[in-house]
Amino acid sequence: MCIRDRYSGPTTATVNDEVCKWMLSQKWQPSIRIASPYFDTPEYINSISKSILNSFKKDGTPDLLLLSFHGAPKRYLIEGDPYHCQCAKTGRLIKEKLKIHDNKFMISFQSRFGSEPWLQPYTDETLEKLGNKNIKHLSVITPGFSADNIETLEEINMEGREEFLESGGKKFTYIPCLNDTKEGMDLLHKLALKELAGWI
């Protein structure tokens, strides 16, 4: 099971390729099952939504909730990679689950590099624009990451916070990844049991 909630060629497919390469080298090949992406499963949506609600109770309801996903070159979308569409569906399902109005919700894409166009809107530019608007309290979550890392802790919670506050925002709340919380571990347990249902 690849701990990636959505499919993308450079991530999930790369893992699958390595598994298949290993299988080619085996004289006796075991039965294998590759878990499906879980970006739209009730278990995942409920876990992320609960994390968001817990943050709202602790830090207050923001003027806007921003979901920042890892970016990818735009050409991947044009070539048929479903990643962008799966990010959009995750966002829609979370928005519906939390009953958030369109004007209080956005998705964006972070971590771009190189010169070619990537999926938009870009998170860094979005944070600056939101600070310049009448958005005083912004909450940001990175639902595409199962655990916090340099791209969430530094790029969003440090650099992103600074961009938003320096452009006029007053309060920036970073909502951590599920990490090893009870919700995070329960999610992985449920997903594993679902995949194993026909095997054990």
Regions found by a protein language model. Give the residues of each.
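Extended amphipathic ligand-handling, pore-lining, and cofactor/metal-binding catalytic surfaces
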Residues: 4-200
